[in-house]
C-alpha cells in the first residue's frame, strides 16, 4: 500500500460551514457566493442555515436549477453542465489531469471557474486561460511549458505526479475508549443516514429514470423508508408501509417503515435525498426528507433516537414483491420454512 500526503486544509468541512452560519447569523457576511450547492436543503438541521442566510444582504447562487437555496438568494446565475466546463483534477497518487469540455455551452451560463476568476485574480478571463495559467504557475514550472501543456491536453494526464510517497508507521495499539461515548439507552435506536443509491443526496431527484431504479436490498422505487429489523417489527407490531414518527432530540420526522432482513435490531437506516420541495416537476414531494434529524457533530449517524408507531399507512412500491406466492393457498404452507432457511434473521 502506498501513502501520499494530502493538503487537508484545501478540503471544506462541516466545521467551516458551522463557522459560516455563525457569521451570517451575527451579520458579519454581506456578500455570499454559493457555488452549485444546496445547503438550505441538505445542511445539518442544527446549523440553521436557511434562517442565517436570510440575514445576508447579497446572496448569489450559481446553480443549474431553481432549488430550495435559490429561493432565498438575491441573485441566481445559470451554471454550466460538467460537459461544458474546463477544469482539472488530481488522483490520489498525485497525477493531475485536464478536464476538457465536450461541447460549447448551450445557454448563457457560467462555470465555477468563470465566476471565481474575477474575484480571485481581479481579472475576467476564460476558464481555459485560467486553467492554463494555474498549470503554468503550479504544475509545469520548468522546461518547455507549451509543449508539456499540449502533451497533457493530448494524453489527458500529466504523467509526472506532483505528490511524493511517504512512509507511514501503523499504530501498534488502538484505544477503545472512544467507543464508550457511543452507547444506546434502552428502547433507543441508532439512526444511520446513507446517500440514496439513485438520487444520491437529492441532487438527482428530478431524474425519473433514476427514481425508477429499484434499490439494493429493498427494491424500493420512487420513495425512501425507515429500514427496520424483523425483530423490531415483530416486537412493535409494525407492518411494511406503516408510518413511524422518529424523534431525535427536539426534531422529528414521519416516514414509512420497511422491514429489512439483516438490519441490526438496534439500528434504523434512513436514506437521504428525498422530500424535495424545489427540485423540478418530477422530483418535488417525492419521498420523505430526513435531513432535519442530522446533526453537524455526527452527520452520518445519531444515537438515542426513538420511534412512535402511528395508525397510518403509506403505499410503498417494491419490485421484489412481483410474482409473490406467499398468499397463494397452495404455496403458503411451505413459505415459512423456506423463509427461515433463506433469509438472514437478526
Question: Where are the model-predicted features located?
Answer:
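A cross-kingdom feature strongest in bacterial/archaeal respiratory oxidoreductases
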Residues: 3-106, 136-344
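Non-catalytic, well-ordered alpha-helical segments in soluble enzyme domains
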Residues: 111-136
